């Protein structure tokens, strides 16, 4: 079947719209501390994304997954989650200083396209 010019333009525009929306998903660009890093306890964890975040739909959980010399199930760590100095940053601030161990931040980021993207960042505190 041959497409007339209007049908072709409509299909082309729809394809471009879908492509543009797919590119609008936020991606984690960097984190502080960095994925897999080991160092002193951070006062805060910063996640930097490729897109502006919709803060009311974005969030994170901080979990201690291992502690030196002890076996235990992952333990939730009380922390506040807020926006950073720019709309592409999420800040996780632990309620108390982090002790030695392995930590994981499970994050959920939503940008203007409203599709949630999830991921995690793991780091160790000496």
UniProtKB/Swiss-Prot annotation:
<feature type="binding site">
    <location>
        <position position="70"/>
    </location>
    <ligand>
        <name>Cu(+)</name>
    </ligand>
</feature>
<feature type="binding site">
    <location>
        <position position="72"/>
    </location>
    <ligand>
        <name>Cu(+)</name>
    </ligand>
</feature>
<dbReference type="Pfam" id="PF04234">
    <property type="entry name" value="CopC"/>
</dbReference>
<dbReference type="GO" id="GO:0005886">
    <property type="term" value="C:plasma membrane"/>
</dbReference>
<dbReference type="InterPro" id="IPR007348">
    <property type="entry name" value="CopC_dom"/>
</dbReference>
<feature type="binding site">
    <location>
        <position position="25"/>
    </location>
    <ligand>
        <name>Cu(2+)</name>
    </ligand>
</feature>
<comment type="subunit">
    <text>Monomer.</text>
</comment>
<keyword id="KW-0614">Plasmid</keyword>
<comment type="function">
    <text>Copper-binding protein involved in copper resistance and homeostasis. Probably mediates copper resistance by sequestering the excess of copper in the periplasm. May act as a copper carrier in the oxidizing periplasmic space that exchanges either Cu(I) or Cu(II) with its putative partners CopA, CopB and CopD.</text>
</comment>
<keyword id="KW-0574">Periplasm</keyword>
<feature type="binding site">
    <location>
        <position position="67"/>
    </location>
    <ligand>
        <name>Cu(+)</name>
    </ligand>
</feature>
<dbReference type="GO" id="GO:0046688">
    <property type="term" value="P:response to copper ion"/>
</dbReference>
<feature type="binding site">
    <location>
        <position position="115"/>
    </location>
    <ligand>
        <name>Cu(2+)</name>
    </ligand>
</feature>
<dbReference type="GO" id="GO:0006825">
    <property type="term" value="P:copper ion transport"/>
</dbReference>
<dbReference type="GO" id="GO:0042597">
    <property type="term" value="C:periplasmic space"/>
</dbReference>
<protein>
    <recommendedName>
        <fullName>Copper resistance protein C</fullName>
    </recommendedName>
</protein>
<dbReference type="InterPro" id="IPR047685">
    <property type="entry name" value="CopC-like"/>
</dbReference>
<dbReference type="InterPro" id="IPR014756">
    <property type="entry name" value="Ig_E-set"/>
</dbReference>
<feature type="binding site">
    <location>
        <position position="75"/>
    </location>
    <ligand>
        <name>Cu(+)</name>
    </ligand>
</feature>
<dbReference type="InterPro" id="IPR032694">
    <property type="entry name" value="CopC/D"/>
</dbReference>
<feature type="binding site">
    <location>
        <position position="64"/>
    </location>
    <ligand>
        <name>Cu(+)</name>
    </ligand>
</feature>
<feature type="signal peptide">
    <location>
        <begin position="1"/>
        <end position="24"/>
    </location>
</feature>
<keyword id="KW-0186">Copper</keyword>
<keyword id="KW-0732">Signal</keyword>
<dbReference type="GO" id="GO:0005507">
    <property type="term" value="F:copper ion binding"/>
</dbReference>
<keyword id="KW-0479">Metal-binding</keyword>
<comment type="similarity">
    <text>Belongs to the CopC family.</text>
</comment>
<dbReference type="InterPro" id="IPR014755">
    <property type="entry name" value="Cu-Rt/internalin_Ig-like"/>
</dbReference>
């Amino acid at each position: 079947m041959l497409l007339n010019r209007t049908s072709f333009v409509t299909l082309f525009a729809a394809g471009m719209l879908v492509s543009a929306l797919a590119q609008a998903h936020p991606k984690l660009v960097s984190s502080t501390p960095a994925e897999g890093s080991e160092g002193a306890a951070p006062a805060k964890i910063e996640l930097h994304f490729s897109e502006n975040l919709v803060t009311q739909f974005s969030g994170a959980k901080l979990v201690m997954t291992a502690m030196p010399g002890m076996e235990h199930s992952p333990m939730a760590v009380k922390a506040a989650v807020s926006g950073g100095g720019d709309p592409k940053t999420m800040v996780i601030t632990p309620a108390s200083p982090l002790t030695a161990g392995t930590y994981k931040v499970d994050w959920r980021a939503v940008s203007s396209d409203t599709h949630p993207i999830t991921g995690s960042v793991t780091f160790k505190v000496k």
